[in-house]
């Protein structure tokens, strides 16, 4: 497993334990750039721990048990819709969608962690992990973290994807939290 050195010891680190087709695939560890995008990083961190309880949707504000509903090979793995499970839902810890915090960080390559959205200022809980350079997303999606360990697991997730984004097997966040 390749490990990338964290950029700041003050930044929180979170993890996903991933299953693919019901089989353990491994752990993905991510550093969240709270020093640059604190509100976005806090939303993701709290959804990893589940500490905020039940949301407006009546569902737990947690990624645990949710799936990566859209995995496009040579592009990205998208998840975070814990309310509907299909890319139409999700919920932030702030109750509603929240604004794009800033675009200081760039989509530099594989391992970039970024917010999925439906246009400007529509951030909720959906996110994606890039598996390739995606600089055309700069200025449109807020980058808030980076995979520091487990990129091999992300590549296994990508292998369960397709060009359409439909997964061949369920890719699930079996457990998650903060390190």
UniProtKB/Swiss-Prot annotation:
Null mutant: what phenotype? Grows and develops almost normally, except for the production of tall fruiting bodies.
Q: Which GO terms describe its molecular function?
A: cyclosporin A binding; peptidyl-prolyl cis-trans isomerase activity
Q: Where in the numbering of this chain does the PPIase cyclophilin-type domain appear?
A: 15-178
**Subcellular localization(s) per the UniProt record:** Cytoplasm, Cytosol
What is one GO biological process annotated to this record? protein folding
**Summary of activators and inhibitors of this protein:** Binds cyclosporin A (CsA). CsA mediates some of its effects via an inhibitory action on PPIase.
Q: Which InterPro entries match?
A: Cyclophilin-like_dom_sf, Cyclophilin-type_PPIase, Cyclophilin-type_PPIase_CS, Cyclophilin-type_PPIase_dom
Q: Name one GO cellular component term.
A: cytoplasm
The catalytic activity of this protein is classed by the Enzyme Commission as: 5.2.1.8
**Enzyme class per UniProt:** isomerase
Q: Which UniProt keywords apply?
A: Cytoplasm, Isomerase, Rotamase
What is catalysed by this protein? [protein]-peptidylproline (omega=180) = [protein]-peptidylproline (omega=0)
Where does the source fall among the domains of life? Eukaryota
Family assignment?
Answer: Belongs to the cyclophilin-type PPIase family.
Which PANTHER family does the entry mention?
Answer: PEPTIDYL-PROLYL CIS-TRANS ISOMERASE, PEPTIDYL-PROLYL CIS-TRANS ISOMERASE D-RELATED
The free-text function statement in the UniProt record for this protein reads: PPIase that catalyzes the cis-trans isomerization of proline imidic peptide bonds in oligopeptides and may therefore assist protein folding.
Question: What is this protein's name?
Answer: Peptidyl-prolyl cis-trans isomerase A
Q: Which organism is it from?
A: Dictyostelium discoideum
Q: Please spell out the taxonomic lineage of the organism that makes this protein.
A: Eukaryota, Amoebozoa, Evosea, Eumycetozoa, Dictyostelia
């Amino acid at each position: 497993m390749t490990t990338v050195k964290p950029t700041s010891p003050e930044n929180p680190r979170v993890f996903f334990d991933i299953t693919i087709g019901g089989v353990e695939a491994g752990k993905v560890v991510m550093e969240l750039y709270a020093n640059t995008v604190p509100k976005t990083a806090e939303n993701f961190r709290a959804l990893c721990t589940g500490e905020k309880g039940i949301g407006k949707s009546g569902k737990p504000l947690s990624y645990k048990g949710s799936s990566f509903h859209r995995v496009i090979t040579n592009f990205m793995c998208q998840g975070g819709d814990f309310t509907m499970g299909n890319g139409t839902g999700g919920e932030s810890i702030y109750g509603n969608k929240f604004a794009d915090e800033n675009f200081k960080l760039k989509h530099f390559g594989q391992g970039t962690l970024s917010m999925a959205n439906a246009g400007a200022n529509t951030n909720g809980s959906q996110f994606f992990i890039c598996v390739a350079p995606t600089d055309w997303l700069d200025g449109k999606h807020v980058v808030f973290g980076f995979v520091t360990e487990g990129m091999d697991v992300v590549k296994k997730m990508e292998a369960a994807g397709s060009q359409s984004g439909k997964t061949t097997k369920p890719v699930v966040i079996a457990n998650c939290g903060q390190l």
